[in-house]
């Protein structure tokens, strides 16, 4: 693989990287779920009573667990997912609440599911385009890398990486 798009947290030390964007973490749940009744968003403390469906990647699990550790709260992990579409049925049948990046809202069945931002505290996740340090790339891949690099440098306000 020449380049990849990865979501933080990720060990970025061994990679050249281009920051792409930040997006908030949200929950996806059945419209009848008690958390769906919170139009302003949900607090991490409100998630302690929900059956949670979280990503399988260990660094992301550690980050989500740290949210609960910060408030000394328990959590109920119902299942782990690698592909969010594979667990949408659990949320549709009101078996659990999916924690995911906001962009996943574009995949939901809006007749049965809704999403709410996690607001207290707010948590965000960044995405990066990465390649290994000093990696030789195919000409087309190298041109793509330089194009993305140019786009992010020519519009720094859109691609501003925050300190986490």
Language-model features and meaning:
Residues 50-72, 137-145, 155-161:
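Secondary-structure junction motif
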